[in-house]
Amino acid sequence: MELARPCSNFQSDLDFCPDCGSVLPLPGVQDTVICPRCGFSIDVRDFGGKVVKTSVVFNKLGTVIPMSVDEGPESQGPVVDRRCSRCGHEGMAYYTRQMRSADEGQTVFYTCINCKFQEKEDS
């Protein structure tokens, strides 16, 4: 005597388990498709005529604007009151990098906005 299966919790497409709502695997060589989450099984014949389509959408590449040699990351950024040791100009742009191990401070690179001379300071 076969037991009647209780009503499903979900009314769903064949892509989803009607008991738990999980995505069902694609039919294979077995006679049934078994839900990997709850164990619900469905006969492969129920998938007859179902067509599976896949597509891959690639994002368009953005326009790349090359930076000139004078416009590197070291000549941009915030300017601090620091005197250039080469030309004496007051005001240098800076940026930081983690050059050493993580438990040590950052390295600060200063660039004179007048003569483009670079200095570095380990902090």
UniProtKB/Swiss-Prot annotation:
UniProt motif (Hairpin) ranges: 103-104
Q: Which portions of this protein are annotated as coiled-coil regions? A: none
| PROSITE patterns given in the database record | RNA_POL_M_15KD, ZF_TFIIS_1, ZF_TFIIS_2
Query: What are the protein's UniProt keywords?
Result: DNA-directed RNA polymerase, Metal-binding, Nucleus, Transcription, Zinc, Zinc-finger
Q: Where are the zinc fingers (TFIIS-type)?
A: 80-120
Give the record's GO biological process terms: termination of RNA polymerase I transcription
Q: Tell me, in one coarse class, where this protein mainly resides.
A: nucleus
Protein residues bound to Zn(2+) 2 = 84, 87, 112, 115
Q: Which Pfam families match?
A: Zn_ribbon_TFIIS
Zinc finger region(s), C4-type: 17-38
The record's subcellular location field reads:
Nucleus, Nucleolus
Question: Per its UniProt entry, which superkingdom is the organism in?
Answer: Eukaryota
A GO-annotated cellular component:
RNA polymerase I complex
Enumerate the Gene3D superfamilies for this protein. 2.20.25.10
Q: What residues bind Zn(2+) 1, as annotated?
A: 17, 20, 35, 38
Notes concerning its domains: The TFIIS-type zinc-binding beta-ribbon domain contains an acidic hairpin motif (residues Asp-103, Glu-104) that likely coordinates the nucleophilic water and magnesium to cleave the scissile phosphodiester bond and release the mis-incorporated 5'-ribonucleotides.
Q: Which family does it belong to?
A: Belongs to the archaeal RpoM/eukaryotic RPA12/RPB9/RPC11 RNA polymerase family.
Instruction: Kindly state the subunit structure of this protein.
Output: Component of the RNA polymerase I (Pol I) complex consisting of 13 subunits: a ten-subunit catalytic core composed of POLR1A/RPA1, POLR1B/RPA2, POLR1C/RPAC1, POLR1D/RPAC2, POLR1H/RPA12, POLR2E/RPABC1, POLR2F/RPABC2, POLR2H/RPABC3, POLR2K/RPABC4 and POLR2L/RPABC5; a mobile stalk subunit POLR1F/RPA43 protruding from the core and additional subunits homologous to general transcription factors POLR1E/RPA49 and POLR1G/RPA34. Part of Pol I pre-initiation complex (PIC), in which Pol I core assembles with RRN3 and promoter-bound UTBF and SL1/TIF-IB complex.
Role this protein plays: Core component of RNA polymerase I (Pol I), a DNA-dependent RNA polymerase which synthesizes ribosomal RNA precursors using the four ribonucleoside triphosphates as substrates. Can mediate Pol I proofreading of the nascent RNA transcript. Anchors into the Pol I active site to monitor transcription fidelity and cleave mis-incorporated 5'-ribonucleotides.
What is this protein's record name? DNA-directed RNA polymerase I subunit RPA12
